């Protein structure tokens, strides 16, 4: 006899999907999104940008290679849940230290498998991201809808995932001192900077400009992170004060915050960009780069007109803004993840562009 379903998803518009539990069995109300990556589920569950989200993996088989300690993107994953079609609880990988389900239990990440992820993804594409309840099979449909109606997703995601104190990452052959504002920073960003001779001081999201200046940076990095960029006005204020004084490089949420600091606007996409194969055109070189992306919001193209920003990159799937710069202020940013993890490395050169700006600053000092 087939195993009985023991978990379910109830979406706020009434859709319902049945499945089986893996990972933690806690009930949660989250925002449902999907990711099209084939591999990289460990980096996905440990990416702070997925805070308060339930991620549907479109690739049908997840868990094959287990979990490797050194591949985490943050020490304490904050993703809400993982939704998959088929889960493999017997990984084959000499580097694996435990199964995906064991890791998810350890960090309280809910999981459900056996779900028709093709239909669910199609629903998200057609109707957009929305609230979902992950719960036990005993929860009735009407009970689930009532819970969804009365539960709001918190807006404190950046403060939740940002570190509370400064942390220093030394480079073996230090050439530059970078201060990174942590809005939910992935570890591979730190690795990418350190590998290029940057000693990195990671500071909390709400660190003011004066304290950052006291660290004598050669350049400032604004990290990725979760949620609505308009929910972190403190960081926008800090960027505004630092503009023109130091070279600044921003990624993902950092890109949105930089744009807002110049007076541009942001808006929420219908279902966001999440995956490792998004084509982007570099307008300066006319080359196409395949990029890794994970974001719900985008910078409004029309709102950039009249600011000091210039659009540098465009998404070829929906023509949204993927990069901006202000040459006179030595500041630039991209909506995607050049550090990959997971994903292609077509855009890793952007870290080298940041290095060039810092080198120019040192030469002109």
Residue ranges and their predicted role:
Residues 2-210, 214-215, 229, 341, ...:
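RNA-binding accessory domains that recognize and position tRNA/RNA substrates
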Residues 110, 177, 247-249, 265, ...:
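Proline-centered loop/turn at the N-terminus of a beta-strand
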Residues 116, 252, 295, 337:
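Active-site glycine-centered loops adjacent to acidic/histidine catalytic or metal-binding residues
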Residues 172-178, 285-288, 326-331:
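Beta-strand-turn-beta hairpins that frame and shape the catalytic cleft
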Residues 175-179, 199, 247, 290, ...:
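Residues that mark the start of a beta-strand
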Residues 218-290, 296-301, 343-361:
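Cysteine-nucleophile active-site neighborhood
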Residues 287-329, 365:
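Catalytic beta-strand/loop cores that center a nucleophilic Ser/Cys/Thr
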């Amino acid at each position: 006899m087939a195993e009985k379903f023991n978990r379910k998803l109830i979406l706020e518009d009434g859709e319902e999907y049945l499945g089986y539990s893996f990972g933690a069995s806690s009930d949660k109300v989250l925002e449902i999104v999907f990711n099209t990556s084939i591999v990289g589920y460990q980096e996905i569950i440990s990416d702070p940008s997925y805070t308060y989200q339930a991620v549907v993996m479109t690739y049908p088989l997840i868990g094959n290679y287990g979990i490797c300690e050194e591949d985490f993107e943050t020490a304490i994953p904050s993703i809400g849940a993982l939704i998959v079609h088929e889960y493999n609880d017997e990984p084959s990988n000499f580097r694996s230290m435990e199964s995906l389900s064991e890791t998810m239990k350890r960090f309280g990440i809910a999981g459900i498998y056996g779900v028709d992820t093709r239909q669910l993804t199609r629903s998200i594409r057609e109707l957009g991201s929305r609230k979902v309840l992950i719960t036990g099979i005993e929860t009735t449909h009407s009970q689930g809808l009532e819970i969804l109606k009365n539960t709001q997703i918190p807006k404190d995601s950046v403060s939740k995932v940002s570190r509370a104190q400064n942390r220093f990452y030394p480079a073996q052959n230090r050439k530059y001192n970078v201060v990174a504002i942590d809005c939910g920073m992935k570890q591979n960003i730190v690795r990418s900077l350190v590998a290029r001779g940057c000693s990195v001081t990671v500071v909390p999201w709400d660190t003011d400009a004066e304290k950052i200046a006291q660290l004598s940076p050669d350049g400032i990095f604004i990290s990725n992170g979760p949620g609505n960029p308009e929910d972190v006005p403190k960081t926008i204020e800090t960027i505004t004060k630092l503009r023109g004084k130091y070279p600044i490089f921003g990624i993902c949420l950092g890109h949105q915050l930089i744009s807002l600091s110049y007076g541009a606007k942001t808006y929420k996409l219908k279902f966001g960009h999440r995956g490792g194969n998004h084509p982007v055109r570099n307008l300066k070189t006319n080359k196409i780069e395949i990029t890794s992306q994970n974001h719900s919001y985008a910078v409004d193209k029309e709102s950039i007109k009249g600011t000091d920003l210039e659009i540098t990159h465009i998404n070829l799937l929906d023509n949204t803004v993927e990069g901006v710069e202000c040459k006179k202020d030595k500041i630039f940013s991209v909506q995607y993840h050049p550090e990959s993890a997971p994903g292609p490395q077509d855009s890793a050169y952007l870290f080298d562009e940041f290095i060039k700006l810092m080198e120019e600053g040192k030469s002109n000092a």
